[in-house]
C-alpha cells in the first residue's frame, strides 16, 4: 500500500533446485568423457539392466538413482524440519511485525519505553491482524527449514563432487569447488539471522539436520556413489578359497621338472579345488574336509631330499653282519695259532673282527657266537686292549 507499512513476505531458498542441474551435468560429463583406464574402475557399470518393460543404460541408471535418492532426501529433510517446528512452536524474532496485534481492542495499553506495562498472556484467535499464513509461519522457527534444506543440498553435492570426479594435476580443484558450494548455504543462514527471521540456534539446528541426512544417504544408500557388486548367492568358505590366488611352491616346481612329459600336466593344478568329504589326520587332529593339491595316483613324483640342518648329527652307518665261520675239526694250517701263524682256532676267529669294540657288539647281538668272547666280554670292560688281544 502507498504510504503504508511495507508487507512482509515469506522467503524461500532456491539453492536445492540447482543440485538437480549440477548432478545432471556431472553425469553427462562422465558419460561423454569417461575416466582413463588407470583410474579406479567401478564394478557393474558396463551392464545394461533390463526391467519388465524397459532397458536402462549405465549413465541413465546412475542419473535416475542419484537424483531419486536426492529427491527422497529433500522430502525427508522437509518432514523432519516441519515436525520439529510444530512440536516446539517457538516464535520468530519478527513475530510481532507479522502479527500486528490490536492493543486497544485487546484492552492492553501499547508498550512504550517509559511505561512497559504488565505482561499478559493473550489467547484470543483474533488478536493478530496480519496475514494468517504469515502468522502461522512466524510461530514455527525451530529448526530453520531453509537452513536445513540448503545444508542438505550442498552437503550432497559436495560429497558427489569429491567421490565421483577424478582430477589430475592439482589437489586444490575439488576442495575449492566444494567450498564454493558450501558458501551459499552459509550465506542463507547469515541472512536469516540478520533479517530477524530466525535465531542463530534455529539456523544451527537446521544445518545439523540437513548435513546428517545427506551424509546418511550418501554413505548407506548410494554407497559413496559407487555401484554395488553383482548380487548373487553367498559363496561357501571352500568356494571362496578356490577363487583365491595361489602361489607355486619351489618343491612343486622341482617335482614337475623331474616328472615325465605325460604326467606333467596333472602334477601342479592351477588352483585348489574342494575334494570329497573325508577324514584327514593332520598333526593329531581330524579335519572333516580336506583340500588336496596332489597329482593323480597315475603320476608320482620322486621325493625331494629334505635339507639337513647343521645342528642335527649325522648318523653313523651300521656295520654289516659277518657270516658265522664254519666249525673246524682242528687247527688248519692257514689260520694263525695263539702265538702266531699256526695257532688255535679261537685266535683265528678273533682276527675276523678288526677292533675289540665291534667284536663285543656282535657278540651281544648274537651274530658272532663264540664261547671265547662270551666268557671274556665282562673282563673287557675293565681290562686294556692289549690284555684282551
Curated annotation (Swiss-Prot):
Covalent S-S links between cysteines: none
Pfam families: PAP2
Phosphoserine sites (modified residues): 236, 249
Ranges of compositional bias, category Polar residues: 265-278
Protein's UniProt keywords contain Transport: no
Family affiliation: Belongs to the PA-phosphatase related phosphoesterase family.
Protein name: Phospholipid phosphatase-related protein type 2
The organism of origin for this protein: Bos taurus (Bovine)
